[in-house]
Structures are given as C-alpha cells and as structure tokens.
A protein has these predicted regions:
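Short alpha-helical segment of the dimerization/phosphotransfer core of two-component systems
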Residues: 20-25
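Helix-loop junction within the histidine kinase core
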Residues: 36-47
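Glycine-rich G1-box
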Residues: 65, 139-140
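Short beta-strand/loop element within the Bergerat-fold HATPase_c
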Residues: 110-126
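Short conserved segment of the HATPase_c
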Residues: 141-153
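A conserved beta-strand-to-alpha-helix junction within the catalytic ATP-binding
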Residues: 46-61, 93
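Short helix-loop "hinge" at the ATP-lid/N-box region of the Bergerat-fold HATPase_c
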Residues: 103-104
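Conserved catalytic submotifs in the C-terminal HATPase_c
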Residues: 46-51, 68, 73-83, 118-120
Length: 177
C-alpha cells in the first residue's frame, strides 16, 4: 500500500483488501477456537431475545458486497409467527454466517442465493420452531462428499472446488452447534 500512497483510489482499494483479509483471518481463528471449545464440551450457550429477522438480515449484510461483486443475487424471505425468539444469538449468527459464506464462495458469477427464516408452531402453546435455510445454485458437491461435509477440516478435492479458499471448519461447527 505504501508504494501507491500517491494514488488515493489504489490506496483505498489496498486498505479495503487488508481489512477484508484481517477479518477473514480473525474469523478463521475464531472458528478454530470455537471448534476446539465445542469438541471439548466447553461451549456455553448465551440465550437472549432476538429480533430474528433483523439479526438474520444483519448477518447477510456481511456478505452483500461480496455477492454483489460476483453479480450474485442474494434474496431473503421470512415467514414468522413471532418476530422475537429466545435463542443463543451469537451461535445462531455463527451458523448463519458459515452457511451464507459457503453459499457465496461456492456459487459462481451471476448465481442465486436464497436465504429464509420460517417458523411453525412448536409443541408448547406460544412457542415456535424456527428454521433457517440457505439454498444456492452453486457448484454442488459429489454424493461421496455429502457423507463427510460436517467433519472438521474436510473439503471436497475436485479441480473446481480446490480453487475456492476455505479451511473446512465451518460446516463442522454448523453441525455441532
């Protein structure tokens, strides 16, 4: 970045890249630590009231620029019985982040990613079951790999997938949480 200090546009671009790389590194480190805590039964749940639609949209906002830069369409739908739920918001956000991150990573230019939150009545009166979905028209995965997707550090090894950066930690965390 120092070499381009005379070009504000390039400097801004490089600084943004540095920021994104730093955020990605922090996310990777946090994922490794979370996985270690989960596997050692040291995960603590932090339940609080969540405005589920707002929290979900905030999570998706982290990926909006990345999706836009790839020409991807990122849509959100909600069908809620109760706008507020009692949930472990940090871990729910982590699950959503990992799912959407993978969808954006593995969906090509011009692809579509559909995210949704739906609720159905729960077993107890006044309660509901909340379902988060993330669907895309990305490159997909082989039938063989589908059996291993939730194993920590597992990544499909094909020429198409190998071009995509990732640690293979995210889906292991999703499964365990």
């Amino acid at each position: 970045a120092a070499r381009h200090s005379d070009d504000p546009a390039k400097l801004k671009k490089y600084m943004k890249n540095i920021q994104v790389c730093g955020q990605n590194l922090l996310m990777l480190l946090n994922n490794v630590l979370d996985l270690a805590r989960i596997e050692n039964d040291k995960t603590e749940m932090e339940y609080s009231v969540s405005d589920i639609e707002k929290d979900f949209r905030n999570c998706l906002a982290m990926f909006r620029n990345q999706a836009d830069s790839k020409g991807q369409t990122l849509t959100v739908t909600t069908q809620l019985l109760h706008p507020y739920i009692y949930a472990d918001v940090p871990h729910l956000t982590e699950v959503c982040t990992n799912l959407v991150s993978n969808a954006v990573k593995y969906t090509g230019a011009g692809g579509t990613i559909r995210c949704g939150v739906t609720q159905k009545p729960g077993e107890k009166e006044g309660w509901c079951d909340t379902v988060v979905t993330v669907a895309d028209n990305g490159i997909g995965m082989s039938q063989e790999f589908q059996q291993h997707i939730f194993e920590p550090f597992e990544r499909e090894r094909t020429s198409t997938v190998s071009k995509v950066e990732g640690s293979g930690i995210g889906m292991g965390i999703v499964k365990k949480l």
